[in-house]
Amino acid sequence: MSCCNPCLPCQPCGPTPLANSCNEPCVRQCQSSSVIIEPSSVVVILPGPILSSFPQNTVVGSSTSAAVGSILSCEGVPINSGGFDLSCITSRYCGSRCRPC
């Protein structure tokens, strides 16, 4: 039994909401009750170091040397092993925004 009438949903910008919501308060009276929860014991075993050493000048995801990194570029800006700005890469894939509802 619902305590309030469902509100009219606005047109969502993105995924459809799973449920409608209302702004008016929903009041239900319940009897007093108590619940005791006893957690079970959990044993967590952490592994040792997976990579004991990792070369600093290796291009991640490649088996070639860091010299190849100067060939890679994003919108004409060379990408090298010294770190680079991801903004030009992410703007290409994440730059589009939802239109307003």
UniProtKB/Swiss-Prot annotation:
Family recorded in the similarity comment: Belongs to the avian keratin family.
Quaternary data: The avian keratins (F-ker, S-ker, C-ker and B-ker) are a complex mixture of very similar polypeptides.
Q: Pfam families recorded for this chain?
A: Keratin
Keyword check for Acetylation? yes
Concerning InterPro entries, the annotation shows:
Keratin (IPR003461)
Q: Could you read off the lineage of the organism from its UniProt record?
A: Eukaryota, Metazoa, Chordata, Craniata, Vertebrata
Keyword set, alphabetical order: Acetylation, Keratin
Q: Per the record, GO CC terms?
A: intermediate filament
What is the originating organism of this protein?
Columba livia (Rock dove)
Modified positions (N-acetylserine) are S2
Please state what the protein is called.
Feather keratin Cos2-2
